[in-house]
Curated annotation (Swiss-Prot):
It is a peripheral membrane protein. This is Ubiquitin-like protein ATG12. InterPro entries: Atg12 (IPR007242), Ubiquitin-like_domsf (IPR029071). Forms a conjugate with atg5. One of its GO terms (cellular component) is autophagosome membrane. Keywords: Autophagy, Isopeptide bond, Membrane, Protein transport, Transport, Ubl conjugation pathway. GO terms for biological process: autophagosome assembly; autophagosome maturation; autophagy of mitochondrion; glycophagy; piecemeal microautophagy of the nucleus; protein transport. It is found in: Preautophagosomal structure membrane. Belongs to the ATG12 family. It comes from the Eukaryota.
Amino acid sequence: MTSSLLLTNLPHDSSSALEHAFSFPTAKITVRFQPIGSAPILQRPVSKISSSQQRFETVVAYLRRVLKLDRKGGEGDSVFLYVNSCFAPALDEVVGNLHRCFKDSKDQLIVTYSMTPAFG
């Protein structure tokens, strides 16, 4: 703001909007995992994860661990994750943002997974 000749501070409504832009209404969100194709089915397809600090890479690591894809000394097999069977989010995307934008009517983030690329 110091470089602006006309605007010395933000208007009140802009300041209050920015305060709430990065806050999440719930501390934990529900993630439902659904397999695509021949991917193995999870025993517990629903998990809770922190909404504010966790990135999507945490969801990928959790699913790899549950599916036992991480092997000693190697990368292991691939797993491909999609939100709402539409797109693969970036690994640095905050899970709370994905939940806020793409949750279903049951307030769950649907993450589908496959062992081979499923879309595009």
